[in-house]
Amino acid sequence: MIGKAGKVARWLAGAAMALTLAMNPALADDTLDRGIGSEWSSLDPQVNFDAAAGWILADAYEGLVNFDPDGKIVPGAAETWDASADGKIYTFHLREGLKWSNGDPLVAQDFVNGVLRTLNPDTVSEKGYYFYSTIKVKGASALANGETKDPLTLGITAPDDRTVVIEMETPAPHILDLVGAFQFAPLHSPSFDAGGAGVFIDPSKVVSNGAYVIKEVVPQSHVLLEKNPNYWDAANVKIPFVKYHVTEDVGTELKRYQAGEIDITYDIPLADMERLTAETPDEVRVFPSTYLIYYSFNLSNPDLANIDLRRALSLALDRDVLENKIVKGGATPTLSYAGGFDPDYKGPSIAEADMSQADREALAKE
């Protein structure tokens, strides 16, 4: 996403919201069949960067915290945590008796090892920036850039088996969102050291710590997950199996849902959205996401390089008409990069936000 002010015209927050057709009333068996659209690029939690695998990995791996159905942060592998007065140091206290899916003890150093692998240049992971840019962990940039290989320089440590300490260069209250994602998945070093990255797609070798464990991987077809009996909250995991189906064409996936082949789809063609909402209102679910759609301008064009012109275009664009009359995808018009997904987030003060569209257009003409 482009981050320089004035380079883009923001227009819709969550315009590509995950649109969910509710699960069929009764599962045909003990398996929840979910559509994920395109095939995953990787099932390696320290490498994956696509949404398709994200659903799978979120079931197979758990970070230090988790999220409830409303998106609120709740305890995950860590049952409690606290922050220093200056907000630069977060200390997470793991639950007692955590285990990997194979029964091995899960300890704090496993989380540290996961981050170290992400930052290792040999891993060729695009996710290192989470740690040296998004939350600016001490020592993360030097490790990612190959300036040092000393793991002791990283500001993420495990003083004992049940404590993870994260030390940052600057305060980052959004750190909890990061450590709750599979980006902060722990690494089972014994299996990885024995089999390398190949263990993540080999059901006979993969070891994870989430509610489910990968049991079957069939390229261009599906990934089957089975309930992990060693998960700390296994008693509350009610569905024995989850099967993720690949369907490259969004229209075809919708047909598979309507035929009862899958129970949930997150891909609905925009052309069908209005009709489906009217015909099956009890099945369509629209929920907010952090996805943002925006216009990006070619700054090599002398006219578009003029920041005043770009600002005028942004002011003149009627985002409400664009969403409600044209796109009709359930998005929320926005004037900033950060939308309203996080109820605790206080956005920037934008003067134009209190203007009518007519006033914005008048200002654009100036």
Regions found by a protein language model. Name each.
Residues 38-54, 77-78, 104, 126-127, ...:
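A structural "hinge/loop" feature
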Residues 79-130, 165, 256, 303-305:
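Aromatic- and charge-enriched surface segment that lines or borders ligand/interaction sites
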Residues 215-226, 243-301, 312, 320, ...:
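Extracellular/periplasmic solute-recognition and catalytic clefts
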Residues 30-41, 79, 89-92, 111-114, ...:
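Short, well-ordered beta-strand elements
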Residues 333-366:
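Structural transition elements
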Residues 35-85, 116, 205-208:
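N-terminal lobe/hinge region of extracytoplasmic solute-binding protein
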Residues 93, 119, 123-190:
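Surface-exposed binding/hinge segments that line
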Residues 151, 162, 168-237, 241, ...:
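Gly/Pro-rich hinge or "lid" segments in bacterial periplasmic/extracellular proteins
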